[in-house]
Amino acid sequence: MALVIGVTGGIGSGKTTVTNMFEPLGIEVVDTDLIAREVVQPQQPCLEAITQRYGPQILLADGNLNRKKLRDIVFADNSERLWLESVTHPAIRQLTVQRLRAAKSPYVILSSPLLLETDQYTLTDKIVAVDVDEAQQVERASARDGQSVEQIQAIMQKQITRQARLAKADYVIDNSHTLEHTHSQVQALHQTFTMLATAIEQK
């Protein structure tokens, strides 16, 4: 398997902005947010389990999952959140491993908001934290998702703290300034990771 670089960050940190900058450099990105959506598509076992638990009212008219309704349920009851994770996390991990193994680029990015909160970090060789301060997280996430400040803060409370994330990271990208500033950091890390991948290949 290629060298795996985990990229994580709190809600509103701009993690996806950063990982999107690696793709034009020829680097494959495995995004667990997208995989999490795949495993609850119609006809998938995870969606069938969710429908059995909450009934057909958890679905939209077209048969897709009503994400807002499910999100409201799991935020209101921690036991429901734990149940949902017990159903979806194994499926997400299985598909994530398949995609990482199939990657053909010199190294591969594993993008995950819960990299350090779950066992996904065990799939990585190095970890990059995308960092902004908490006030920027709330402002950006609210503008992007239209969620209330309370909902965003509830998500932040379920994620590892900013300090703990930075302590566990091998590299940090400061995403609090301009896109150009972020891009220059990505370019520098790309050089580092390419050299690391080459060194591993030559062993």
UniProtKB/Swiss-Prot annotation:
It catalyses: 3'-dephospho-CoA + ATP = ADP + CoA + H(+). GO terms for molecular function: ATP binding; dephospho-CoA kinase activity. Disulfide bonds: none annotated. ATP binds at residues 12-17. GO terms for biological process: coenzyme A biosynthetic process. GO terms for cellular component: cytoplasm. PROSITE patterns: DPCK. Keywords: ATP-binding, Coenzyme A biosynthesis, Cytoplasm, Kinase, Nucleotide-binding, Transferase. Its EC number is 2.7.1.24. InterPro entries: Depp_CoAkinase, P-loop_NTPase. The keyword Hydrolase does not apply. Pathway: Cofactor biosynthesis; coenzyme A biosynthesis; CoA from (R)-pantothenate: step 5/5. It comes from the Bacteria. Residues 4-200 form the DPCK domain. It is found in: Cytoplasm. Belongs to the CoaE family. Catalyzes the phosphorylation of the 3'-hydroxyl group of dephosphocoenzyme A to form coenzyme A. This is Dephospho-CoA kinase. It comes from Saccharophagus degradans (strain 2-40 / ATCC 43961 / DSM 17024).
